[in-house]
Structures are given as structure tokens and as C-alpha cells.
Amino acid sequence: MEITLSKTLPSYPSFVEGIRRAPDRGYTLTPAQTATALKNALRYIPKELHETLAPEFMEELRTRGRIYGYRYRPQGDLKAKPIDEYKGNCIEGKAFQVMIDNNLCFDIALYPYELVTYGETGQVCQNWMQYRLIKQYLEVLTREQTLVIESGHPLGLFKSKPEAPRVIITNALMVGLYDNQKDWHTAMQMGVANYGQMTAGGGRYIGPQGIVHGTFNTLLNAGRLKLGIPQDGDLRGRLFVSSGLGGMSGAQPKAAEMAGAAAIIAEVDASRIETRHTQGWVGHVTDRKSARLSS
């Protein structure tokens, strides 16, 4: 069985105003590395479309520091649908489609158009060609097969058995000699390494609820260790000051509340503040213009 993208060129999608976009990651490749990066992206594309898409991919690489293949992103919001609305030969194949669409939903993903779910760089996969191919593989996956995905690249379906994993994923396994920031950045640009965080590339992101219990335990134990709080006590009467209201750090205000403390959490991105407030992780929002500190 051969899984390929269509020879029909998709229409270039429009971008919804107000949706967060990832910053330019920086283009630092040599000419030879650039050629390899283009080949790595074009390997997913039928040869008939290479001449059209090569300049487009080059422009993405030059201006965004990555080749995302925006043209292959489905139009609109990728909200997770009821599982029975997905094509598939097994429940696991359908379930994984639900999970990755949930990771890329406008209401959930940090930078939906760049496939970043959370953590500033945590991607589901590297580009939209990989997304489409992964979806196609999941639609035909059976309980006698396992899909292997390497840094977003769908390696293929392998003969397996029902009790084995339906999907095996690895992300960004760098050889020790090249496990440094410079070579990592090069590998990302060239399309051979994907930083999936924990649950972005793993397809199972659940937001701050995944870390709130650990944050609660950390705060409470810090109080016991540093403030002499008894084992059966909590942090009432204490003020917790921190920063960050992202996908993980957004658990801080709720964790502090659970531990009995008051909390002040600073965040420079207004959109992230709005998201956490709407979701209930933050109880009150103010800005520096309205905030007043008494002397």
C-alpha cells in the first residue's frame, strides 16, 4: 500500500485574523543545507508540483525559519470532531485523529498555523504535509499494524499485533555530538527534527490540568520546607508571586488557590492572559495602567 498526497495543488488557505502566529525562528542555513531542507519538504509532494512549490517553500524558510507547507493546511479551525465522524479501520486510528486535531484547535493550540500546541516550540509535527499523510495512514491503520512516526515523519505501517501499540512516536533524538542549541536549530530548519514537548508531538495535550496537581504539590511542599507549614496545614495567609500564563505555567494561579495562597502572576502576552482567564485558571485580571501599589 502506498500513501501519497494528491497531485492536485490545494488552494492557499486564508489566515484568520486574531489567531496567534509563531515568530520567525531564524534562517541560518548554508546553501547546501538549504537545498537539503527543500528536498526534505518536497519528498512529500508529487513531482509534478515541485516546480510550483519549491519557491513557496523557500520563501517560508527564508521568512519564517521553517517550512510549514501552509498550502496543505486544511481551511478553518481543526476542532476535534466526535470519534465516529472520522474515517478508520480501528478505534485507535480514529482516536489518534481526534487527539491531533484537538492539539491544533484554535482554542487550544498556541500557534495553530505553525502546528505549535504549547511550550512556544512544541509541535504536533513539522509541517502540514506530514499532518495530511499521518491522517491518511491513521484512516487505513488496522489492529494488526503499527504506525511509526519519527519527528513528524510518518515512516510507514508495520505488521504488528492487537496488543502492541498502534502508533510509536519518537521526536528529536539528536546524536550526542550534535546535541547542542546550534545544531538543533539547524536540524529543525532542515526538517529532520521536531520538538514535540511531551504531549504536543505525542498527540495528547490536556492543557494546564496536566500539570496543576504537580504545581500544587510543589507549592505546598515548598511552604512546608521553607516556611515551616505543618503537614496538615496549607498556604493560607501567604502570597505567591510568579510569572507565566502559558499552557503549562497557566496552572500556577489555580494551584496556589488550591493550596490556600493568594497569587500574583505576571504575563506579557495579553492573549494568553485572556485564554487562562476565560478557562478559569485566573480569577482576576488587571494591567499596569490600572494596578496601584500602595507605599
Name each region found by the language model.
Residues 29, 268, 286-288:
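Short coil/turn linker and secondary-structure boundary residues
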Residues 189-280:
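Hydrophobic, well-ordered beta-alpha structural blocks that scaffold small-molecule cofactor pockets
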